[in-house]
Each structure stands twice: as structure tokens, then as C-alpha cells.
From Swiss-Prot:
The keyword Cell inner membrane applies. It is a multi-pass membrane protein. Belongs to the SecD/SecF family. SecD subfamily. GO terms for molecular function: protein-transporting ATPase activity. The gene is secD. InterPro entries: SecD, SecD/SecF_arch_bac, SecD_1st, SecD_SecF_C, SecD_SecF_C_bact, SecDF_P1_head. It comes from Desulfurispirillum indicum (strain ATCC BAA-1389 / DSM 22839 / S5). It is found in: Cell inner membrane. This is Protein translocase subunit SecD. The chain crosses the membrane at residues 5-25, 353-373, 375-395, 398-418, 450-470, 477-497.
Length: 515
């Protein structure tokens, strides 16, 4: 036995042994996909237009505050569409404001200038950058929420420019998961405008700097709205949930109800202390997603940076609220464009049918190869079993998730592996018909079939890579198993079966090849 053959046999034994080690025990090493173990699939679209509008709203509020601090005599700054309109009736104020914009707000460009009006906005490049950043922030925020929700092996990935795909295996409370993921959680602190009665505001007598928001009163049994209270709030946001450091569920022993205690960061605590110190006796509203949760009276300056959000919460609702506040608000609302739920019973049924399909397909192929190619068919069957071992080992090594399309990829891999052996065996038969000896026929058969097998597998591999790059979860699962299967089939068909032939020829010279 020469050194090359020994090296081949050692390599084959090492690869097979390593793959058996990787894939054992199989049920622990290979994770099942959503369609096999049950769970939820969501497709979300991020409203990137609103992300830009929110950015402009924040900039508008900042400019109003800046104008007040600089004592500039100008009109009411407001956003209209994707532009900020700044009325400037006096030439001096206009020049001063333009200098201020260049010095402090260089990210905004002057898009139009009239005698008594300045129009600013973001460039097209900046708008696209804001949109891209919004999707990235939404992706990270949703990941954080899911991590705190406690789902094992979730999939959260971006698709296209604004879509986010989420797969949550094993989730049972679907409604709660959807609420937790899709909630914007925009937390704002605003002062109540007590100079205007709610009746006047509802009748249309509302100052430009104010708006009406409602506090909802929910039925704790049915979780439906039974009443709501209007509040007139200043549009200016004192600060948002960006200043939030922590949010925890606490229990109020006096009323026997849970509430959410929030802790602000250093800058947030400073702002909170300043606002509460300057507005003792006034009401400060805590607004979440456009609804007033509470509007307590400020009794004294609060330097601790601690506040609480109370309401008619159940323990589960308070827990979910603390999760979304800790993970941060979404930079823009998200729309659920697809919501699919697979029950565990259906998933188990898919597993059973998938195993049955692989078993039947494998058995038919094994029988055909032995019946048609006799002893050589038996060698091909050994290579096919090695192929499956390598496939499972590499799936476990790469942490791939096995899906129903992935099982289809395994079945297709069986066909590809057999196809390579069929090409080799037919070439060997051609050489035998020409009168070549078994040894020479085997050498020539493998040599002449190699380029055909390589070309066919490379083209299939290219397609699999494209499917993986541009496909979603199930398609990616198919592409992964197909890619690994192609590589495994080339290894087993070209190297393993030939090494076995060579080993047989070393110990028993063959006059007639069983093929």
C-alpha cells in the first residue's frame, strides 16, 4: 500500500470521525427552523419618512428654544412637510439667524430665502442617511426587546432598504410578542398648558404651541378603553426616552398595583431637576406613544432623576413596558406587513413527513444503485452515507438552522451525490468496453468524469450562493444545505469511492469489475 492511499484513507477517516463528533447528539446540535418546531414569522416595514419628520420636529423645537435664548424677534418656527419655515420680519434678525444656523446647525441647508422668510431642510443625501440609520436603530432596538423577552435562537435581519424579518421559534403568546416588537415606545415629558381650558381647546380655541392628547382609562378585565381624559399639552418636548438609564417594575403597596420606575442619565437628571425646580405647582405630563399616562403636579424640585409611570397596569403589561423602555424607542413606527404563525403540531407533522421523505428517497436510491451497478453501486451507497454524515456534521459546525426547504435541499443533495457516481461509473463502463483493465478503467473513468462533475457542481454552487445572498429565512436554509451537500458529494464521489476501489485492488487483484 503506497503512501498516497494511506493519506487518503486517513483523511477520509478523520473527516468522517470529526463530522460524527460534531453532529452527535443530532437533536441537540442542529437547531430546527420555524416551520419545523413552530413559532412566529413577522415582516415589518419601517416608516422611514416619519423618521425624517421626527428629526425635523426635534430640530424645529431646538430652533424655537435657541431663538428664545438668543432673544431673536421672529415668528413661530414650524415644520411643513420636509422643510422648516422660519418667519423673520426684520433684516437684522434675519442676518443674525442665518449666522446662527451656519454656526450651530450646519446639517441644515438654506433651501429658499424670501424677504421675510427662511426655509431650511436636509439635503437628499442627509435624508437617505437618516432613513438608513432609522432602519439600523429599529433593527437593534427590536433585537434588544426580543433578547429581554427571552426567546431562544431568534432571527432578526434586514431585508432590502426598510424591511425587517423576524422569526421567533417556539413563541406561544403571539399577541404579546407582536405588541412588544411593534410598539414605538416614544416616551416624552411635556408641561400641561393650564392657561387654556380643555373645553376651549376641544372647541377649536387652541394655541399654535399646544395640542390635545388623551389619557386612556382601560378595563383591566378586557383591556379595552372605557373612557379617556383630554389634556392640553405644550408641543415643546422637555426631554425624551433617550435620557432613560433604566426602567424597572415596582409594586405600590398602597393601591396594590404595579408601576414602572424610571431612572434618568446624568443629563436627563439635570434637565429634570431644572424643569421641576422652575415649574413647582404646575403639572408635568408623561406621554408614551401619543397617550398621556399620568400628569402629576410638581410639588418640589426633584434632583434624583427618578420618576414613575403609573396606570391601570397588569403585571404583564408593566413588565412589557419596562422592557420596551429599557431597550429604547423605535426611531419610527413599524407596519406589520406579514404575520405567520406555525403551531408546534404542524411543525412536528412537517418533521415526520420530512424524515419519511428522506428515508424513502434514500432507500430507493440505494436499491437502484445496487441493482444497476452491483458491487460498485454498493460502494456508491457507502459514499452516500458518508455524504449525509459530512452534511450533518457541517450543518452543526456552522450553527445552521434546519428548515423544511433545508430538508428538500438534503433530498436534492442525495440526487446530486448519486449523479456524480453515475457519471463516474458510466465512464468506467466505456473504458471496460474498449478493453481496458479494471485498474486502468477506474483511473480513466475518474479522470474523464472529473471535469464534468466539477463544472456541474460549480454552476449549482453559484446558484446556491445567490439564493443565500438574496433569499429570506427558508430560502437561505435550502441554500445552506444545498451548498454543503454539493461540497460533501464532490468529496465522497471523487475521493472516497476511488480510495475504496484502490484499497480493494491492493488486496485483491480484480480481473472483472462488478459494475
Amino acid at each position: 500500500m503506497d503512501g498516497k492511499l494511506i493519506a487518503k484513507l486517513l483523511l477520509i477517516a478523520a473527516v468522517i470521525g470529526f463530522c460524527i463528533h460534531l453532529a452527535t447528539p443530532l437533536n441537540e446540535k442542529i437547531a430546527l427552523g420555524l416551520d419545523l418546531q413552530g413559532g412566529m414569522h413577522l415582516a415589518l416595514d419601517v416608516d422611514t419618512e416619519q423618521a425624517v419628520e421626527r428629526k425635523l420636529d426635534a430640530m424645529t423645537n431646538a430652533l424655537r428654544l435657541e431663538a428664545q435664548q438668543q432673544h431673536l424677534v421672529i415668528g413661530t418656527i414650524q415644520r411643513r412637510g420636509m422643510q422648516i419655515l422660519i418667519p423673520v420680519p426684520y433684516a437684522e434678525e434675519k442676518a443674525e439667524f442665518k449666522r446662527l444656523m451656519q454656526r450651530r446647525y450646519g446639517q441644515l441647508e438654506l433651501q429658499d430665502e424670501q424677504p421675510e422668510l427662511l426655509v431650511y431642510g436636509y439635503t437628499t443625501y442627509d435624508i437617505e442617511e437618516i432613513k438608513e440609520l432609522a432602519v439600523g436603530q429599529a433593527l437593534e432596538t427590536i433585537r434588544n426587546r426580543i433578547d429581554q423577552f427571552g426567546v431562544s435562537e431568534p432571527t432578526v435581519q434586514k431585508q432590502g432598504d426598510r424591511r425587517i424579518i423576524i422569526e421567533l421559534p417556539g413563541v406561544e403568546d403571539v399577541d404579546r410578542a407582536v405588541e412588544l416588537i411593534g410598539r414605538t415606545a416614544m416616551l416624552e415629558f411635556r408641561l400641561v398648558n393650564e392657561n387654556v381650558s380643555t373645553r376651549d381647546a376641544l372647541d377649536g380655541f387652541l394655541p399654535e404651541n399646544s395640542e390635545v392628547l388623551y389619557q386612556r382609562h382601560m378595563d383591566p378585565q378586557t383591556n379595552t378603553e372605557v373612557d379617556r381624559t383630554p389634556f392640553v399639552l405644550y408641543r415643546d418636548v422637555i426631554f425624551t426616552g433617550d435620557r432613560l438609564l433604566d426602567a424597572r417594575v415596582r409594586f405600590d403597596p398602597q393601591f396594590n398595583t404595579p408601576y414602572v420606575s424610571i431612572t434618568l442619565d446624568g443629563e436627563g437628571a439635570r434637565l429634570f431637576a431644572d424643569v421641576t425646580g422652575r415649574n413647582v405647582g404646575r403639572r408635568l405630563a408623561i406621554v408614551l406613544d401619543g397617550h398621556v399616562h399620568s400628569a402629576p403636579v410638581i410639588n418640589e424640585r426633584i434632583p434624583s432623576g427618578q420618576a414613575s409611570i403609573s396606570g391601570q397596569f397588569t403585571m404583564e403589561q408593566a413588565t412589557d413596558l419596562s422592557i420596551v423602555l429599557r431597550s429604547g424607542s423605535l426611531p419610527a413606527p413599524v407596519d406589520i406587513v406579514e404575520n405567520r404563525t406555525v403551531g408546534p403540531t404542524l411543525g412536528q407533522d412537517s418533521i415526520d413527513k420530512g424524515i419519511l421523505s428522506v428515508t424513502i428517497g434514500m432507500a430507493l436510491v440505494l436499491l437502484f444503485m445496487v441493482a444497476y451497478y452491483r458491487l460498485s453501486g454498493l460502494l456508491a451507497n457507502m459514499a452516500l452515507l458518508m455524504n449525509l454524515i459530512i452534511l450533518m456534521g457541517l450543518l452543526a459546525y456552522f450553527g445552521a438552522t434546519l428548515t423544511l426547504p433545508g430538508i428538500a435541499g438534503i433530498i436534492l443533495t442525495i440526487g446530486i451525490a448519486v449523479d456524480a457516481n453515475v457519471l463516474i461509473f458510466e465512464r468506467i463502463r466505456e473504458e471496460l468496453r474498449r478493453g481496458a483493465s479494471p485498474r486502468l478503467a477506474i483511473e480513466e473513468g475518474y479522470a474523464k468524469a472529473f471535469s464534468t462533475i466539477l463544472d456541474a457542481n460549480i454552476t449549482t454552487l453559484i446558484v446556491a450562493v445567490i439564493l443565500f445572498q438574496f433569499g429570506t429565512g427558508p430560502i437561505k436554509g435550502f441554500a445552506v444545505t444545498l451548498s454543503i451537500g454539493i461540497l460533501a458529494s464532490m468529496f465522497t464521489a471523487i475521493l472516497c469511492t476511488r480510495a475504496i476501489y484502490e484499497l480493494i485492488l491492493v488486496y485483491k487483484p480484480i480481473r472483472k469489475l462488478s459494475i
